[in-house]
């Protein structure tokens, strides 16, 4: 069920007089007090039989004669968004979860007492009606009401601006109001739900089992990020909100589940930006007996199908530019990408640590920071890529063959020393996915963990901890495996043409209100 565009209806709430909100609230509280005196103020005995969206889809094009020939009885409820009071008959536009529909309210049909009460009702009130479908003289599908009830009194006025909430932060802070008045916002989150359902259907169709792994970790792992720290009182131990589920999911591969995935929250105690929220949704999946090449093909198909299911097409428009997910995704190495968008760099320069350090200073990069203390050519190449090429990757592009020093959990290449079988997928200049052939050599993994600990001891807060239990799991033997993580929020941004990650998170984190 989806909302239909109706030229006879506003896309948001009707404007309310520019009065002081406190005065309006006081007046509405007085009305509520009167209602309480008359009986149950918030009844819960009305059950709708229809939704506005279904009625609009099925009956909007019918003529009045057809509706008279076969009367359609309905019971429907929703929020009153428009109200036009006249003499013996009035109109109200009511919005439910699917669309809007007009009520035609005649004093003779509902009775004088109910009609008098209706005149006092306010925009935002939750109302219910029983009646028969009809067409007005202007051809608008309406409910000729025979029974009218107030189910919930709205004490606060809806935004007075015709276009809803004008302040962007207020939209995020009071998402419940934004959802009431903005069809665009409602459509965004419906698309998100469709995308999530598509991902799950695709995974199930390819033999993956959905699992749930811990949100509280004794050791943070699976990504280079700063964790949130908490304390478990019963166990009297420090714990961390998970930054990634990776190491637990790979333990399941060790245990014999050959294809697993999880869609859930990750938490990273880092900055907020149009692309970053400290609490975000990820999908990670792992498949035994696959590698990063298989993963790239699979991820491409997965994202393409999600676009079709959520948007109806794989050819999208994002921020005014076409984005074609139907075409094969590009594949470039880090150095190839740098030289494509910054062709002044030679192969020799990109292999020269001293040159790269000097070049990065031109981009205001502090190469004396802790994370660069023992940085090799791979780390420096990656930073140069981020500065010169990343934002240019508008079309879907897999950046492949990452250096081992920035890929502590990825399997090394059998043919390219110092390189791993890893990729990151970029679309519209943003990272959408990260995947690789998994490192299943326990001794190699232990050594990489030790190097991460050295970086952490040197001051790199995002370096990984040593996870002895994960090493123990690998020592039981993990089959060759490929694994990938997809940022759901960023994917939904693409599918809904949303410029800010907060636009696709129902309740994003904000600073406290003053």
Curated annotation (Swiss-Prot):
Superkingdom assignment? Bacteria
Q: For the region Disordered, what residue ranges are annotated?
A: 1-22
Does the UniProt entry include the keyword Chloroplast?
no
Catalytic activity as recorded in UniProt: tRNA(Lys) + L-lysine + ATP = L-lysyl-tRNA(Lys) + AMP + diphosphate
Tell me which residues bind Mg(2+) 1.
Answer: 424, 431
Q: Which spans does this entry mark as compositional bias, Polar residues? A: 1-13
Q: Which GO terms describe its cellular component?
A: cytosol
Question: Which InterPro entries does this chain map to?
Answer: Aa-tRNA-synt_II (IPR004364), aa-tRNA-synth_II (IPR006195), aa-tRNA-synth_II/BPL/LPL (IPR045864), Lys-tRNA-ligase_II (IPR002313), Lys-tRNA-ligase_II_N (IPR044136), Lys-tRNA-synth_II_C (IPR018149), NA-bd_OB-fold (IPR012340), NA-bd_OB_tRNA (IPR004365)
Could you tell me the EC number(s) of this protein? Answer: 6.1.1.6
Family per record: Belongs to the class-II aminoacyl-tRNA synthetase family.
* Name of the featured protein: Lysine--tRNA ligase
- What is the organism of origin for this protein? Ralstonia pickettii (strain 12J)
At the highest ranks, the source species' classification is: Bacteria, Pseudomonadati, Pseudomonadota, Betaproteobacteria, Burkholderiales
């Amino acid at each position: 069920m989806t909302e239909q565009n109706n030229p006879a209806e506003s896309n948001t709430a009707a404007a309310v007089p520019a009065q002081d909100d406190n005065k309006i609230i006081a007046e509405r509280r007085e009305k509520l007090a009167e209602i309480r005196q008359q009986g149950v103020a918030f009844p819960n005995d009305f059950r709708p039989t229809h939704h506005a969206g279904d009625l609009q889809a099925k009956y909007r094009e019918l003529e009045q004669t057809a509706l008279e020939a076969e009367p359609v009885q309905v019971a429907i409820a929703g929020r009153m968004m428009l109200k036009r009071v006249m003499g013996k008959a009035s109109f109200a536009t009511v919005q439910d979860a699917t669309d809007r529909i007009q009520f035609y309210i005649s004093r003779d049909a509902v009775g004088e007492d109910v009609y008098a009460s209706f005149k006092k009702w306010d925009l935002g009130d939750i109302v219910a009606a029983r009646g028969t479908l009809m067409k007005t003289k202007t051809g608008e599908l309406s409910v000729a009401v025979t029974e009218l009830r107030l189910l919930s009194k709205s004490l606060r006025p809806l935004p007075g601006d015709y276009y809803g909430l004008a302040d962007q932060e207020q939209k995020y802070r009071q998402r419940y109001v934004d959802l009431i008045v903005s069809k665009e916002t409602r459509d965004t989150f419906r698309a998100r739900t469709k995308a999530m359902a598509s991902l799950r259907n695709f995974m199930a169709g390819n033999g993956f089992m959905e699992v749930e792994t811990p949100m509280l970790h004794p050791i943070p792992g699976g990504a280079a990020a700063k964790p949130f720290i908490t304390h478990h009182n019963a166990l009297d131990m420090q714990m961390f909100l998970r930054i990634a589920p990776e190491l637990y999911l790979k333990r399941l591969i060790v245990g014999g589940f050959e294809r697993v995935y999880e869609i859930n929250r990750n938490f990273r105690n880092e900055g907020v930006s149009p692309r970053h929220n400290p609490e975000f949704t990820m999908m990670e999946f792992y498949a035994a007996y696959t590698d990063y090449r298989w993963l790239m093909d699979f991820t491409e198909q997965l994202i393409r199908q999600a676009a079709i299911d959520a948007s109806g097409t794989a050819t999208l428009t994002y921020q005014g530019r076409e984005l074609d997910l139907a075409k094969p995704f590009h594949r470039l190495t880090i150095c190839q990408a740098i030289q494509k968008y910054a062709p002044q760099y030679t192969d020799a320069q990109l292999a020269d640590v001293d040159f790269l350090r000097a070049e990065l200073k031109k981009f205001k990069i502090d190469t004396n920071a802790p994370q660069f203390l023992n940085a090799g050519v791979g780390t420096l190449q990656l930073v140069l890529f981020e500065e010169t090429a990343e934002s240019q990757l508008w079309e879907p592009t897999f950046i492949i063959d990452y250096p081992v020093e920035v890929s502590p959990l990825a399997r090394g290449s059998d043919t390219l020393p110092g390189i791993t079988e890893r990729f990151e997928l970029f679309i519209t200049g943003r990272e959408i996915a990260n995947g690789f052939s998994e490192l299943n050599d326990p001794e190699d993994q232990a050594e990489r963990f030790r190097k991460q600990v050295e970086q952490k001891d040197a001051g790199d807060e995002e370096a990984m901890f040593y996870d002895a239990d994960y090493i123990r799991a690998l020592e039981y033997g993990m089959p060759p495996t490929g694994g990938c993580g997809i940022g759901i929020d960023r994917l939904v941004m693409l599918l809904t043409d949303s410029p800010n990650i907060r636009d696709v998170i129902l309740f994003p984190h904000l600073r406290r209100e003053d």
